[in-house]
Curated annotation (Swiss-Prot):
Residues that make up the propeptide removed upon maturation: 21-74
Location of this chain's protein in the cell: Secreted
Name of this protein: U16-barytoxin-Tl1c
Keywords, alphabetical: Cleavage on pair of basic residues, Disulfide bond, Ion channel impairing toxin, Knottin, Secreted, Signal, Toxin
Statement: the UniProt record of this protein carries the keyword Signal: yes
Stretch forming the signal peptide: 1-20
Species this chain originates from: Trittame loki (Brush-footed trapdoor spider)
Tissue distribution: Expressed by the venom gland.
Recorded family membership: Belongs to the neurotoxin 14 (magi-1) family. 06 (ICK-Trit) subfamily.
Length: 116
């Protein structure tokens, strides 16, 4: 019987003070909601800033890729005919008349430049 009286008195006290704290709880909930909205706003601003940074990086990478696509035009390798009717020789090679097969095809060939 004593335990029931103790529990009932605790129930009455909890009900009484629970109602008194309800206004405080509502104020705390409002503060929590406002803080969440602030955090959401700040997170959104940070995301926008990050997005702008990523777009800047992407544009620089695309520029580099475009530069990479503007490579040297097709060129002839070593021992390939060259001249006015053919593509130019690649870098490091020169278009010269050779003794080997130049006489047969009647055109100069791309060869490593001679030092003479």
């Amino acid at each position: 019987m004593k335990t029931i009286i103790v529990f009932l008195s605790l129930l009455v006290l909890a009900t009484k003070f629970g109602d008194a704290n309800e206004g405080v709880n509502q104020e705390q909930m409002k503060e929590v909601i406002q803080n969440e909205f602030r955090e959401d706003f700040l997170n959104e601003m940070a995301a926008m800033s990050l997005l702008q940074q990523l777009e800047a990086i992407e544009s620089t990478l695309l520029e580099k890729e475009a530069d990479r696509n503007s490579r040297q035009k097709r060129c002839n390798g070593k021992n390939v005919p060259c001249g006015s009717n053919h593509s130019p020789c690649c870098s490091g090679l020169s278009c010269e008349e050779t003794f080997g097969y130049g006489w047969l095809y009647k055109s100069p060939y791309c060869v490593i430049p001679s030092n003479g």
